[in-house]
UniProtKB/Swiss-Prot annotation:
This is UDP-2,3-diacylglucosamine hydrolase. Its cofactor is Mn(2+). It comes from Xylella fastidiosa (strain 9a5c). Keywords: Cell inner membrane, Cell membrane, Hydrolase, Lipid A biosynthesis, Lipid biosynthesis, Lipid metabolism, Manganese, Membrane, Metal-binding. It is found in: Cell inner membrane. Mn(2+) 2 binds at D41, N79, H114, H203. Substrate binds at N79, R80, D122, S160, D172, Q175, H203. CDD domains: MPP_YbbF-LpxH (cd07398). InterPro entries: Calcineurin-like_PHP_ApaH (IPR004843), LpxH-like (IPR043461), Metallo-depent_PP-like (IPR029052), UDP-diacylglucosamine_Hdrlase (IPR010138).
């Protein structure tokens, strides 16, 4: 049996081909899985569970089919969809996980996280994250009208794009690569904090398997891939794990 782990789909009405790939994945490759974990950024934007979205409706229905069939579904919010709440979770049939958290995968304790917590060189983003994850901010934000929330999300996205464009112009993208990737010291600190030998995260869109030494322990960090030019899924079973790519339709 296999556990399937994905992240960074960034589902958006403007990229319907990715939505179709994900729905096909759910139809054809999920039946019989031990569990499915979605580690954030399932959606490109989420401004509250009352947000009208045909894409979100189709995804919820497809996920619910597997939940009703007995497959455990888990969702960890990302930086794009951290406002996914209990109402949508109930519709889709998944359990919302804290970021980070430790799960047992076939006898191997594994720390799961979206991954943005490890990108501490991006000081501007970490400040924005701290502000927008504050419970008081969230409660106040969700009382605003849909149009006001959408305007805030659009402004935040434009600011993010401008920030990243500025980084790319410095030192031939060297600064961009550094700031948007994880900080090794933070990775080591998280391994030390949780006392596990395996970590799985997304966010950076740099799929790979990394091996490192932490306090004389050999640890593995698995980085999930995004769903832009292809799909990406991590398959984990009792024998190990493998990162697989899914081809876009057409």
């Amino acid at each position: 049996m296999t556990t399937l782990i994905i992240s960074d789909l960034h589902l958006d009405p403007l990229r319907p081909v990715v939505t179709e790939l994900f729905l096909r994945f759910l139809r054809e490759q999920v039946s019989g899985a031990d569990a499915i974990y979605i580690l954030g950024d399932l959606f490109e934007v989420w401004i509250g569970d009352d947000m009208p979205s045909e894409v979100a409706d189709r995804v919820a229905a497809a996920l619910r089919t597997h939940a009703d069939a007995g497959t455990p579904l888990y969702f960890m919010p990302g930086n794009r969809d951290f406002l996914v709440g209990a109402d949508y979770a109930a519709r889709a049939g998944f359990r919302i996980l804290p970021d980070p958290c430790v799960v047992d995968l076939y006898g191997e304790p594994t720390v799961l996280l979206h991954g943005d917590l490890l990108c501490t060189d991006d000081i501007a983003y970490q400040a924005f994250r701290a502000q927008t994850r504050d419970p008081e901010f969230i409660a106040q934000f969700l009382t605003q009208t849909l149009s006001a929330r959408l305007a805030f999300a659009q402004q935040a996205r434009l600011a993010s794009h401008a920030h990243q464009s500025g980084l790319k112009q410095e030192d031939d993208c060297t600064q961009f690569e550094k700031v948007t990737d994880v900080v090794p010291a933070d990775v080591a600190a998280m391994f030390a904090c949780y006392g596990v030998n395996r970590m799985i995260h997304g966010h950076t869109h740099r799929p790979a398997l990394h091996t490192l030494q932490v306090a004389e322990r050999t640890c593995t960090r698995v980085v999930l891939g995004d769903w832009y030019q292809q799909g990406s899924v991590l398959c984990v079973d009792a024998d190990g794990l493998v990162l697989e790519q899914l081809l876009l339709p057409g």
